[in-house]
């Protein structure tokens, strides 16, 4: 009995086929296995060839910089480098880290062989006077630009030179209707800005300022874009403070003939700040003072374009009132530089963007006489309603926070505008005379 029990215990202790025993640990297995994998089927050769090709590619192609070389759109007008604006992207304040992360930018140097990542930018009113010059700068920087314009005051001719560029797109659209686009930045310039245009359709003007701004702010909120509103010095009305600083609230007539524009812009500023505070939309506000330059509408009623067109046509220069009203005039290139610095900077604003050089209307007329026709006559007419008596920006804030100030004086910039107007005025006249001659021949035949 005892021996039987011993034998059974002995049988129980014998290993079975299904029993699990761990394999002995091989200390170099994690190293030798990948090496055997690489050595089989000539895999190592392919890896070395790939490394060699990549090294060759990144060695041959030069390292790109963060911004593309700038080409001056005013070179055709004869501006020398010291007289024109020079882009100062490197001198601009760095955008916020949150904004850089959202648009996909990264800190540090750009790797070899890679280019700066261009932004997708929409410019409402981009076929207009200021908007088209802004588009030129953005395209030269390497961005993808979408122009949204209803061509009420804009002209296709202002942006036709970009039609063949795959990074340019133009949409005929009125901003009072919503639009959905995937963009990184929104420059909201769309609105009639001359008395002739906004008095022609005042309801349309205030709708563009209010409803159009609401739609663009809504777009910025949906897609996480940064929004820049181009407001105006008209928010100061007929100012009681001179010069005007951004903290001045203005002296505006809410029921005057200019109110559709003045109050519309004031409301647009209110909406912009409400979206910033309530919906965390990144916004910027620029208050633009009188601007002149190539591509201005010839007969838009603004004083500089009026004087230049009248002098070229040998007509009297019409001065309204006693001519002692003052204005400040900045060249369009200076304004565009200020807008871009504001958009890329860290400060909301508002910022005055204008040239603090102040001229009376009579002084401006004399400068136009000196530039075009010394024999041009000056004709006085009754002043228009609600015409501000003084207008001059205090740009201390822009100097300190944006590092911006205008570079082109009136006597430097006016000849460039005259050259553009001369081509368009006499070109139109030649076309008109040719058409008249053709009509006469057809009638006589």
From Swiss-Prot:
Q: Which residues bind NAD(+)?
A: 149-174, 261-265, 302
User: What are the protein's UniProt keywords?
Assistant: Acetylation, Decarboxylase, Golgi apparatus, Lyase, Membrane, NAD, Signal-anchor, Transmembrane, Transmembrane helix
Coiled-coil intervals in this record?
Answer: none
Lumenal compartment segments: 65-445
Question: Is NAD tagged as a keyword?
Answer: yes
Residues bearing N-acetylalanine?
2
How is the protein disposed in the membrane? Single-pass type II membrane protein
Record flagged with keyword Transcription: no
This protein's name: UDP-glucuronic acid decarboxylase 2
User: Whose protein is this, by species?
Assistant: Arabidopsis thaliana (Mouse-ear cress)
